[in-house]
Amino acid sequence: MVSVINTVDTSHEDMIHDAQMDYYGTRLATCSSDRSVKIFDVRNGGQILIADLRGHEGPVWQVAWAHPMYGNILASCSYDRKVIIWKEENGTWEKTYEYTGHDSSVNSVCWAPHDYGFLLACGSSDGAISLLSYGGEGQWEVKKINNAHTIGCNAVSWAPAVIPGSLVDQPSGQKPNYIKKFASGGCDNLVKLWKEEEDGQWKEDQKLEAHSDWVRDVAWAPSIGLPTSTIASCSQDGRVFIWTCDDASGNTWSPRLLHKFNDVVWHVSWSITANILAVSGGDNKVTLWKESVDGQWMCISDVNKGQGSVSAITEGQQNEQ
């Protein structure tokens, strides 16, 4: 049974574009066209406003929490072409870094798994993807993939650090040899996979073609060590695809249509166990989908989104605006 356990009145003055829980599930970050980022304490069903962060000069599209091993850190991106990294010090949130290396709207930010290091991917309407890595002493190193997507990049999502098949193949006590990968979706109707080479440069690893309009979001599913990699993608064409790869080399990806919606699909988000997918679309609903034992994806719930509020859903710990 899926039910709404909490609804947070954010008091944003315009449309909410993203809402993300932190690692521990006690804090909620939201962002809006009103140019603000807000952080709430949502423990025990409450909603206490902790911070109202003002630093962007345009609509804020997305927020992303860093792993807590790096402290209480939040990244945000905006139409104003900026990425801002916020940090909490002694109970006060402050801007700790501002990246202005893009020529157009920055549409997506995503922190890499902590096993990869303190690393942030940023996708922009200028077609480029930036990789920001912390080098210490307040310094950030920037690598940029130019022309990653024709017209623009709308979404980025990191591959999990758990290696597919490690649950059955990894020798006991042996340190994993991680290969950094992430997925991106763009205005060229493509999902692309990127891999870091031994020399530290990033190259296109795979190009996944199935959508007939702009790819609005991609989400690489968490891995529990089973020998399958899974990615969800959604598009302006109203379709959601589930991409799976069963070979160890990661070269063969197969798409499966989850559903064809009657409107644009803006976001897809996996539960932490990767067995439930939340889909948020232009029909003002969030639907939850679960794979049955025979491999069919079934809709198990749909929730109407509120105006200016964020709802927390019990099943799969999914959170959508």
PLM segments and residue spans:
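WD40-repeat beta-propellers
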Residues: 37-42, 83-88, 129-134, 156, ...
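Terminal intrinsically disordered, low-complexity extensions flanking WD-repeat/beta-propeller proteins
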Residues: 163-170, 177-180, 216, 226-229, ...
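WD40/WD-repeat beta-propeller blade N-cap
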Residues: 9-16, 53-60, 99-106, 146-153, ...
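Beta-strand-rich domains and repeat architectures in extracellular enzymes and scaffolds
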Residues: 9-35
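A short helix->beta-strand "capping" segment at the edge of beta-propeller domains
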Residues: 1-13, 46, 254
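Loop/turn segments within WD40 beta-propeller blades
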Residues: 19-25, 64-71, 110-117, 157-179, ...
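Conserved strand-to-loop turn within each blade of WD40 beta-propeller repeats
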Residues: 31-34, 76-80, 122-126, 134, ...
